[in-house]
Amino acid sequence: MITLIGTGHVFDLSAALLNIFEEKEPEIIGVELDPQRYQAIMLRNTDPTTYHAAKKNLPIIYKMLAQFQENMAEQYGVNAGDEMLTAINYAQSHQLPVAFIDTNAQQLFVHMWKIMPFSEKFKLLFSGVAGFFVSKKRVEQELKHYQENFDSYIQEIGKKFPTIKRTLIDERNEYMVLKLVSLHEKHQKIVACVGDGHVPGISALLQEKQIPFETIRLQELQKPHIQEMNGSSAHFSINYKPF
């Protein structure tokens, strides 16, 4: 069984995630990171000066996205990617293996930028600059729109930024599913933490491959009663696909 958890990289989800891990008792925990991004997050927390110096060599759009996430996470009192560190730290403290299930982010962004039409690059850069001035309230409004109208939201992204949708969403979904299928062949109980926007696509691909899974979405993680549970009696609204 794969438990697929939809997270948000700028929200404080630690308490909810720990409750789920205690409830599910996984044999292995997968995270939407590649080893290089994990090392970068650790460097950010242990040596900020070196981390910021290293960021100068990253692709420009990668840097813009990372900075936007860091700015928004700061408004929520966390660091971007803290939910992935929560998962990794839990695994390490319980002597569980960790699986990095995402593709190499830097290579992905270089490839995406190379194949992206100029018009899409221009729109993306403009949106990226505008993103630095987005308020917490606006992010929450967008999140509500996304949660209530996921299909139309993804369609909008596909129309405005087709290369981004194909590269950052669709192709990564396929890559992560291959990783999850490989884990499923070796482990009975798997918990995987991925960005919530990947959950529908990954779910559809797992269903095609007849892999049993359940999902816990970001909206559920953010409910106060989930955050406040002590882990002994956690219950979630779960979409279960038995085969």
Regions found by a protein language model. Give the residues of each.
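Compositional signal for N-terminal targeting/processing segments
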Residues: 1-243
